[in-house]
């Protein structure tokens, strides 16, 4: 942060002065990053993808192989549990927004069924992405993505 502020001709103290604490800064960053998600734009835009297309896009080798531009839930999910309440609150709200948006695309005869499918889908997507990135065998990683996409994509 010091280097960034120095290049901008500012002090890092002045930057931090805009926040009550470093925890508040972390919560604000989390909320902003989650609010600018390309996935969320696809879920709420005028040309929504099909449920199965969305699952396939998320569980693609391209998404797996680009963690720096990928899903914040997969990147930070296991770490956020050790973060302050304000960061966890921002993370929770971001997840709720995605679950609600995904439920509008999910198959199901009732709102409750679509919400349940959405929750299970988010858990499966994030878990599969984490596992596919963690293993050191490319074929096994592809197999994880394919199995999850097939299973989750079923109505």
Q: What positions do the PLM features span?
A:
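Helix-turn-helix
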Residues: 1-28
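Hydrophobic alpha-helical connector segments
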Residues: 28, 39-70
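Short, basic, alpha-helical segments at the C-terminal edge of helix-turn-helix-like DNA-binding modules
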Residues: 31-37
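Amphipathic alpha-helical segments used for helix-helix packing
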Residues: 51-53, 65-92
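An amphipathic alpha-helix signature
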Residues: 52, 96-103, 115
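Short alpha-helical scaffolding segments that buttress acidic/His motifs in well-ordered protein cores
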Residues: 58-59, 73-77, 121-125
